[in-house]
Amino acid sequence: MRSVEIKVNNIEGLHARPASRLVGLCHQFGSSITISTHGAAAVGKNITEVLSLGAEMGNTLTIKIDGIDEARAEKAIKDFFRTGAE
């Protein structure tokens, strides 16, 4: 299992477009991916749950990845937030 903390840097937070792209990215991996913030958790492959987190700019997301391709999933998710979470 891997765990990574990522700060939301988008001024609009994790709104519909980047959340949808994140969920699509999570679907590319067989690993289980859980995203949590402020005591709430969401399955990374479920758009409704991810949006319900209400992650705003400055919030820290804890992302837990567990499965056979967890290293690749971790790298892809870090890259997503570094380059394209807008």
Predicted regions and their residues:
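Amphipathic alpha-helical interaction surfaces in cytosolic regulatory modules
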Residues: 14-34, 41-59, 73-75
